[in-house]
Structures are given as C-alpha cells and as structure tokens.
C-alpha cells in the first residue's frame, strides 16, 4: 500500500485521508507574500543546523550538505530563479522541499527540534530587526535634512499659529526644529522597540519546547539576538513586538502627516511661504497652471493606511488563546506594508525637504498681520510693574481699536498709544516700539527652547550632535 507520505505533498499530510481542497489551499497559502522572509529563513535554518551539529543531533556530513544546499537555494532566490509552489504553502516548506530535492535525507533532518511556529517567529524578528535599523537610518536622513534647512533659516521670521490664527512671530528654523524633535523621539522609539524584537524564539518548537538537547543561547549568539524568549508558549504565540513596531510607525506617519499638512498650506498661492521642487509635484490633466503637492497629500493619506494596520494587528491578537493559532498568518501583510510605507515615505521626504525653496518676504509679510507682537506689548507693560492680567486687558483694548481702524499696533504714534490707553500711559515710552518689531519679538525669546536666532543656532548644533551619536 502506498504510504500517505508519497501520496500527499504537504509536510503534515500523513494524518489525513483526503487531499486539501484547492479552494482551501489558495485560502491558506502564504507563500506569495511570506517568501519575502526567504533570506532570513535560510539564515535561521543555517544557525539551527550548526547548533544541531554542535550538539551531535545531526552529523557533520549532514551539516555540510545543508550548508551546500542552502547556498545554492540562496543563489536561486537572489537571481529570481527559485520556483515557488502554492502546494507547499509557505516560504519554509518551499525552501525545505527544495533543500531535500538537492541533498536528500540531510534536508529532512534540518527540521529536527523545530516547528514552523518558532521558525516563523524567528524569521519575522530577524527581518523586522533589519528593517528597524533601515528605518532608523532613514529617520536620521530626514532629521539631517530638516536640521540643514533650519540652520539656513535661523533668522527667517514667520508667523507662529495657534488655532490656525496668527499668534506670535517665530523663526522658520525654530518651526522646523519642532519636527526634528518629533522625528528624534520616533528614532528613540524604534531603537527601544528593537530591544524587544531582538529575542530568539527558536527552540520553543510548536509550543512546549523540545526533547532534544538543544543550545538556544548558541543560536541566539549566531543570529545576533540579545537573548532568548524565556517562555516557549509566549515565544510562538505573541506578536506584541510587531504591534509595538507598527504603533511606533503610526507615530512616525502622524508626524509626517502634520508636516505634510503644513507643506500643503505653505505652498498654496494664498500663503506662498515655500515652493516644493517640481520633481516632487504633479500637474492637472485639465488645468494647465496647476502644480500640486501630491507627495505630502499622499503621505497624509498613507498615514491612515498605517493606522489601519495597527488596528488590524491589535484586533488580530485580542481574542487568541495560547499558543499559536493560524490567525497569526495575518500578521505579515500589515507588517510588510507598514515597513514599505514608512520607509518609502521617509526616503522621499528627506529628499523633498532638501529641495524646499523658502520665501522669506512672504513669511515676514504674514507675520506682520494679526497683531503678532501683542503679547510683547503686554510683556512690556508687565516689566514696568503692571499685573499681567491688567496688561492683557489694556493690550486687548488697543488691538480692538487698531483692528477697527485697519492698522497694526506698531502703526500707532506714541501719543496715539497713550491716548488710547490712558490707564497705562504713564508706563509707555519711546522704547515701546522696539518691542513691537518682529526682530525684537523673536530676539527676546532668548532661552533654551526659545525662538531667538541664537537659540535656534544652538539647537541646530545640539541636534547635529545628537544625530551623530
């Protein structure tokens, strides 16, 4: 009687009396997206094989054959010659089947002491660790581009906004450094997340560990992990590290989206603070004059995509009992797409930021509107002994008068200012007008974290030093 092993293609098929439905086969197969893990799968398998040989679980000849076969498979994959088969379900069984075809029984011994449960968990962690490092580098590129732009605009004055209303003058360099701070925290979160990603699940087997005398710490060292997952059930079943990475990525994209919103506003003709290089914009098929900031607009949209992946992964895990469940196959596509989206976005934003053209005159003209130095006038009165709330009320009255007349505070003569503010007239002198200039306003915020040009230059220096670490 022909054995089930010869009749069925699946590695687990001996237990079953009928072949898998073609519909189910397509529904459950993951090979056409998890093949992305092929090279880390090979790396994990080689580390596992070396440990098995060191522990005398397989022979030195078996190890040599496995290494030789894996080298050939790796080459086939890199050259695009490897034939992926739907019938073999996933990346792991495709590679194992090819290995066995190349080297015979030695290939069948590779899976000793291992399950696909701990194998895939190891693959994902290996792959994600490398992607975190890549994204960290891209965050640094964007930070560097923004730092350069901030340094060039340490003295460029623009309006600062609250509620999208003109609030106080700031320097454009100071404004850009706010985003540098955000992306710096993003980089810190990625590094912190990496510490929890960088634990080895291999050795947990299906869920309970293995009866073989394995050396998990040796495998961890070979693969560059900081240590091993301490509990076999947890090692194969949880994907909190993927959720944590996706949450950190959602914050990256949130910061990109905020920056994008401002770029779109700043580039609009009604604002005209900046121009984005043509290579990052598109036109209209009907309106010849259009130059559209499609890149930042699309980044805003892609932020929702990454947020959706975070919700998908959280929902994926919320109802799973221990240990591994097939639900976890659904972790990869959201994770892969999150990595692709974040990496592509950061790469293009670093290049786009370096090509921004700043329009200082437009920024200055906007800062002169909306009574942006009103707080400075209140501070002037406070420094002459008036309680702040009284100063606030007096200046608000002056703003109302100027608004009705269609002029700015700085347009009032000294006599007019005293006349309109009789209760504080004795506190107002010729020096008041120095407080009402844009330059005087920003220069007065001369403390760490302030918008004064000297502080911006100091912050640029500190940001560069942090980036170099």
UniProtKB/Swiss-Prot annotation:
- Organism equals Burkholderia orbicola (strain MC0-3)
Q: What is this protein called?
A: Argininosuccinate lyase
EC identifiers of the protein: 4.3.2.1
Organism superkingdom:
Bacteria
Q: Which GO terms describe its cellular component?
A: cytosol
The protein's matches in Pfam families, at most eight in alphabetical order, are given as:
ASL_C2, Lyase_1
The primary location reported for this protein is cytoplasm
Q: In which pathway does it act?
A: Amino-acid biosynthesis; L-arginine biosynthesis; L-arginine from L-ornithine and carbamoyl phosphate: step 3/3
Give the CDD domains listed for this entry. Argininosuccinate_lyase (cd01359)
Cite the entry's keywords alphabetically: Amino-acid biosynthesis, Arginine biosynthesis, Cytoplasm, Lyase
Where does this protein reside within or beyond the cell?
Cytoplasm
Q: Which family does it belong to?
A: Belongs to the lyase 1 family. Argininosuccinate lyase subfamily.
């Amino acid at each position: 009687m022909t054995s089930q092993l010869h009749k069925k293609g699946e590695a687990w098929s001996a237990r079953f009396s009928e072949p898998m439905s073609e519909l189910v086969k397509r529904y459950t197969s993951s090979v056409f997206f998890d093949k992305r893990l092929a090279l880390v799968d090979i790396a994990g398998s080689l580390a596992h094989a070396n440990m098995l040989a060191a522990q005398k679980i397989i022979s030195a000849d078996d190890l040599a054959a496995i290494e030789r076969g894996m080298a050939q498979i790796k080459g086939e994959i890199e050259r695009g010659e490897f034939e992926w088969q739907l019938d073999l379900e996933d990346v792991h069984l495709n590679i194992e089947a090819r290995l066995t075809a190349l080297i015979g029984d030695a290939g069948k011994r590779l899976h000793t002491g291992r399950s696909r449960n701990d194998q895939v968990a190891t693959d994902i962690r290996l792959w994600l660790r490398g992607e975190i490092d890549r994204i960290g580098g891209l965050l640094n590129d964007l930070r560097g581009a923004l730092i350069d732009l901030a340094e060039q605009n340490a003295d460029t004055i623009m309006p600062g906004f609250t509620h999208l209303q003109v609030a106080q003058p700031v320097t454009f360099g100071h404004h850009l450094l706010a985003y540098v701070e955000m992306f710096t925290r993003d980089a810190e979160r990625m590094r912190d997340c990496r510490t929890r990603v960088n634990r080895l699940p291999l050795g947990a087997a299906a869920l309970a560990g293995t009866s073989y005398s394995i050396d998990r710490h040796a495998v961890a060292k070979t693969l560059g992990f900081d240590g091993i997952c301490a509990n076999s059930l947890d090692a194969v079943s949880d994907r909190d590290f993927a959720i944590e990475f996706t949450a950190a990525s959602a914050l990256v994209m949130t910061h990109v989206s905020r920056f994008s919103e401002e770029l779109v506003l700043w580039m609009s003709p009604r604002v005209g603070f900046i121009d984005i290089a043509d290579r990052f914009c598109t036109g209209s098929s009907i309106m010849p004059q259009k130059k559209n900031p499609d890149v930042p607009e699309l980044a805003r949209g892609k932020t929702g995509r990454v947020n959706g992946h975070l919700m998908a992964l959280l929902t994926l895990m919320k109802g799973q009992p221990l240990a591994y469940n097939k639900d976890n196959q659904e972790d990869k596509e959201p994770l892969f797409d999150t990595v692709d989206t974040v990496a592509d976005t950061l790469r293009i934003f670093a290049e786009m930021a370096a090509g921004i053209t700043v329009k200082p005159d437009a920024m200055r003209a906007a800062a002169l509107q909306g009574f942006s130095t009103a707080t400075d006038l209140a501070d002037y009165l406070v420094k002459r002994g008036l309680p702040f709330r009284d100063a606030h009320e007096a200046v608000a009255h002056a703003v109302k008068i100027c608004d009705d007349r269609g002029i700015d505070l700085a347009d009032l003569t000294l006599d007019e200012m005293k006349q309109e503010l009789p209760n504080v007239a004795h506190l107002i002198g010729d020096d008041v007008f120095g407080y009402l200039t844009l330059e005087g306003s920003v220069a007065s915020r001369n403390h760490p974290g302030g918008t004064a040009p000297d502080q911006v230059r100091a912050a640029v220096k500190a940001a560069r030093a942090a980036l170099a670490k």
